[in-house]
């Protein structure tokens, strides 16, 4: 078993199977592209369990991903994919960077979901890019871009239904995709309160990493409550 990659939140290892990788979720938490960072015991366990439940739910609703199964409290087995260097962001309600960038009021509900692409490049601080930029950078073709948008909106619909069942609102979320050896585009990485902005339907209280970004509550307690809500749906 060889360490293939280590990022801010996860480590990826080879296995004795060519078509399987092991993902280990770390206890590190970061914000502002790593400008703020801490280690919080239990954070890796929570994100692994939450992502595993959500990926299974998506699979049951026709959304394929790299996820195979949960191995332990902090580990998953996944299919190997070549990550497309784009963060695909879907926004249902204005919050975060878009309010600063375009002047939307925080909490303004969009008429329809907005899909944005951000170039995964730490040196450039993950800039917002257009479809034309993506093609100029040879990141993806027109067909790939259309597939990414379609899949992102399908995922949005399924996640909104899930959050509604938990009396929560899906404000926005960030996802990543990868390509298999045969060129199939699959959802990859994770879906957790680290990568989503989620509000309580009644109070707009955060159930996401904004409690850490803005120092408004305990990240571990917030994520545990979110996990409990997910498990209550089973």
Curated annotation (Swiss-Prot):
It is an enzyme of class 6 (ligase). It catalyses: 5-amino-1-(5-phospho-D-ribosyl)imidazole-4-carboxylate + L-aspartate + ATP = (2S)-2-[5-amino-1-(5-phospho-beta-D-ribosyl)imidazole-4-carboxamido]succinate + ADP + phosphate + 2 H(+). Its EC number is 6.3.2.6. Pfam families: SAICAR_synt. Transmembrane segments: none annotated. It comes from the Bacteria. GO terms for biological process: 'de novo' IMP biosynthetic process; cobalamin biosynthetic process. Pathway: Purine metabolism; IMP biosynthesis via de novo pathway; 5-amino-1-(5-phospho-D-ribosyl)imidazole-4-carboxamide from 5-amino-1-(5-phospho-D-ribosyl)imidazole-4-carboxylate: step 1/2. SUPFAM superfamilies: SAICAR synthase-like. InterPro entries: SAICAR_synt/ADE2_N (IPR028923), SAICAR_synt_PurC (IPR033934), SAICAR_synth (IPR001636), SAICAR_synthetase (IPR050089), SAICAR_synthetase_CS (IPR018236). Keywords: ATP-binding, Ligase, Nucleotide-binding, Purine biosynthesis. GO terms for molecular function: ATP binding; phosphoribosylaminoimidazolesuccinocarboxamide synthase activity. PANTHER family: MULTIFUNCTIONAL PROTEIN ADE2, SI:DKEY-6E2.2. Belongs to the SAICAR synthetase family. This is Phosphoribosylaminoimidazole-succinocarboxamide synthase. It comes from Staphylococcus aureus (strain MRSA252). The gene is purC.
